[in-house]
């Protein structure tokens, strides 16, 4: 029983360590996805889940996503500024 609890605990920890969070970024413009309804926000949550994240919400006028795979880029993109187009 103790071994099972240790294995489950390790799996939870691995899931936490191997994910990241950050502002969702539009790869074409280099800008973060904007939002105006702070807190729980259906638009941001849908965008986050479309990028394989766990949960998205509006934070300081941008869609913040938690639980993203490490392979997904977040704002700001290195070497690319927001063009606003």
UniProtKB/Swiss-Prot annotation:
* Pfam families with a match to the protein in the record: Toxin_3
Biological process (GO) annotations held by this record are: defense response
Q: DNA repair as a keyword? A: no
Expression across tissues is: Expressed by the venom gland.
Q: Which GO terms describe its molecular function?
A: sodium channel inhibitor activity; toxin activity
Q: Which SMART domains match?
A: Knot1 (SM00505)
- Name the GO cellular-component terms: extracellular region
Output the superkingdom of the source species: Eukaryota
In the UniProt record, the signal sequence range is: 1-19
Keywords linked to the UniProt accession: Amidation, Disulfide bond, Ion channel impairing toxin, Neurotoxin, Secreted, Signal, Toxin, Voltage-gated sodium channel impairing toxin
**Location, primary (coarse class):** secreted
Q: Where does the record say this protein resides?
A: Secreted
Cysteine-cysteine disulfides: 31-82, 35-58, 44-63, 48-65
| Keyword Plastid (UniProt) | no
Ranges for domain LCN-type CS-alpha/beta: 20-83
Modification sites for Serine amide: 83
Explain the purpose of this protein.
Beta toxins bind voltage-independently at site-4 of sodium channels (Nav) and shift the voltage of activation toward more negative potentials thereby affecting sodium channel activation and promoting spontaneous and repetitive firing.
Q: In which family does this protein belong, per the annotation?
A: Belongs to the long (4 C-C) scorpion toxin superfamily. Sodium channel inhibitor family. Beta subfamily.
Record text about domains: Has the structural arrangement of an alpha-helix connected to antiparallel beta-sheets by disulfide bonds (CS-alpha/beta).
Please report the name of this protein according to its UniProt entry: Toxin Cll6
